[in-house]
Amino acid sequence: MKYIFETRMMVRDYECDIEGIVNNANYLHYTEHTRHLFLKECGLSFAEMHRKGIDAVVARMNLKFKTPLQCDDEFISRLALKKDGIKYVFTQDIFRASDEKLCFPGVIDIVCRVNG
């Protein structure tokens, strides 16, 4: 996989559930944050796009939870992108930084709505 963007983050204690691992919903926050940072690096902003009448929305997600992250783990969120018709397909993989173990592979399809 050829990634075009990556960012490092840390697991915060409030993101973990009773088992001491990251709650599944937080992986979606991590991938969304990565997309926001990527677009910002490209000179784009979701807020500015919205003001111009363009809303990028998630159309589909294919997710796998492979290896759980735990409190204080540092991880790397990597992103690849391809255009497929009217959708943008983001391949987003999360790796534990200490050993590069794949924790969460995901494919997220984004479509843009124009003026509603």
Language-model regions, residue ranges each:
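Intrinsic-disorder/low-complexity, polar/charged segments enriched in Ser/Thr/Lys/Arg/Asp/Glu/Gln
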Residues: M1-E6, R60, E74-I76, K87-V89
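Hot-dog-fold acyl-thioester-processing enzymes
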Residues: M1-V58, V114-G116
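HotDog/MaoC-like acyl-thioester-processing domains
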Residues: Y3, F65, Q70-C71, L81-G116
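Short aromatic/hydrophobic contact patches that present stacked aromatics
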Residues: E15, N62, D109
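Short, low-complexity, polar/charged sequence segments that are solvent-exposed and flexible
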Residues: N26-Y30, A47-H50, S77, K82, ...
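Helix-adjacent hinge/juxtasegments
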Residues: K52-D55, A59, L63-L81
